[in-house]
Every structure is written in C-alpha cells, then in structure tokens.
C-alpha cells in the first residue's frame, strides 16, 4: 500500500519514512521538516532566533491554522464556481446585465490569485523538494492553468461562448477545487500525524526514564538487602 501512497505526499512530509511504515516504531529520532524546532531546516542548524524568510514560510505552511484557512478559501471558491456553473447552464436565471456572473467570476479570480501567491511561496520555500511531491505539483499546474484561462476569459469572453469552452473552464475549476481540498485535508492529516509522533516520542521517553528509575531502585534494593545481611539483620 505504501508503494502507492508515497506518490501522494505534500511538501514538508518526510519522504524517506513513507516506504516502510514499521520504521516509525523502531526509530524515534527521525526529524522531519515539521518536527524541526519552529520549522527550521534539519541541515541548517540555525539558532531559533535567526529564522530566515524561507524558514518562516515553511513554518507558516506547516501550521494547522493556515491549512484551515486554505480549506475555507477552497470551499468558498467551490461555491463561487458552482454559482457560475448553474448560471451558465441556465439553472439559475442571471440578471439582464449579467452582473452576478461577473461578480462571482472576479471573486473566484481573487481567490485564484491568493492560490497563485501561495504556490509561489511554496516553490520559494521548498525549491527542488517541491518537485518531489506529485500531488502538490499537480495542484500547482491546475492552479496556473485555471488562472491563465480565467484571465483569457476576462479579455475574450465572447470567444469562450462561441467555442463552447466556458463549461469546460468551469469543470476544470471544479477539478482544481477537488484537488485543492484533497491537498489541504492531506496536509492537515500529516500535521496531526506529526503531532501524534511527537506525543509518542515523549511517552516513549517517559517510559524509558521510568524503566531507568526502576532499575536503579532494584539495584538499591539489592544493595540494601546485602547490607542488612552483612549485619545479620533479619527482615
């Protein structure tokens, strides 16, 4: 199963930990991008007070709040696109001047602009690592194509109507929205997994400490028993 899941990772995932799931139980010192203190790169060794702009972006993209915001914006984009699609199919009657479709389109384009900025930030923050995650790359391609098609639609709306490509544009946007939701949900799930790993490592550390204390107490008990026996004291 892991052979297929390794292709659907998001930036910031520990790619080396995907093929063998049992390694998570045997190795508790593997540090991922999300595990690094305050989002620092593992190889940099930078001090906590010297966060670069790239490190700040990595930290931002790994936070659960940001993922929640992205999911909300994607759902909002889905509502706008759905309204546009219903108007295009004449299920909902548009006003005489067709102001409502334009409003929905520009609102959706504004959200697409945000996703373009997010994509640029991810590429800047993760660089070549971004290309290793096919799910993110596919989402980025869909975002860019959707943005270009929306810009072309604004300048040549009549051409889209004549060629019958408007519905195709909407359906392409729906595909982008579905993929965006999948990526966002996956990122949130990965973030929760990392949190659970941290809790598990903390519990393992506590168990090891308790075992060490128990061993010391057993040794002390043996020493005291030997001392009492040397002094012929029964107990």
From Swiss-Prot:
It is found in: Membrane; Cell membrane. The keyword Aminoacyl-tRNA synthetase does not apply. Its main location: membrane. It is a multi-pass membrane protein. Residues 87-103, 156-162 are extracellular. One of its GO terms (biological process) is proton transmembrane transport. Residues 187-231 form a coiled coil. Belongs to the hydrogen channel family. The segment S4 is probably the voltage-sensor and is characterized by a series of positively charged amino acids at every third position. Unlike other voltage-gated ion channels it lacks the pore domain. The C-terminal coiled coil region mediates homodimerization. It is essential for normal subcellular localization. This is Voltage-gated hydrogen channel 1.
């Amino acid at each position: 199963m892991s052979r297929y899941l390794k292709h659907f990772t998001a930036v910031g995932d520990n790619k080396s930990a995907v093929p063998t799931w049992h390694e998570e139980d045997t190795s508790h010192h593997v540090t991922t991008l999300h595990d690094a203190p305050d989002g620092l790169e593992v190889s940099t060794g930078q001090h906590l007070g010297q966060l670069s702009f790239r490190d700040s972006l990595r930290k931002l993209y790994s936070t659960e709040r940001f993922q929640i915001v992205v999911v909300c914006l994607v759902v909002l984009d889905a509502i706008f696109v759905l309204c546009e699609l219903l108007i295009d199919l004449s299920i909902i009657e548009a006003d005489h001047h067709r102001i409502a479709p334009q409003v929905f389109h520009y609102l959706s384009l504004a959200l697409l602009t945000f996703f373009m900025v997010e994509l640029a930030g991810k590429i800047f923050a993760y660089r070549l690592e971004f290309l290793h995650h096919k799910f993110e790359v596919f989402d980025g391609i869909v975002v860019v194509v959707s943005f270009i098609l929306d810009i072309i639609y604004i300048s040549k709306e009549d051409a889209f109507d004549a060629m019958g490509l408007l519905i195709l544009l909407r359906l392409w946007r729906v595909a982008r929205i579905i993929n965006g939701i999948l990526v966002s949900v996956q990122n949130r799930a990965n973030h929760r997994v990392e949190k659970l790993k941290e809790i598990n490592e903390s519990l393992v550390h506590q168990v090891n400490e308790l075992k060490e204390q128990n061993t010391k107490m057993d040794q002390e008990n043996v020493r005291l028993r030997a001392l009492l026996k040397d002094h012929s004291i029964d107990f």
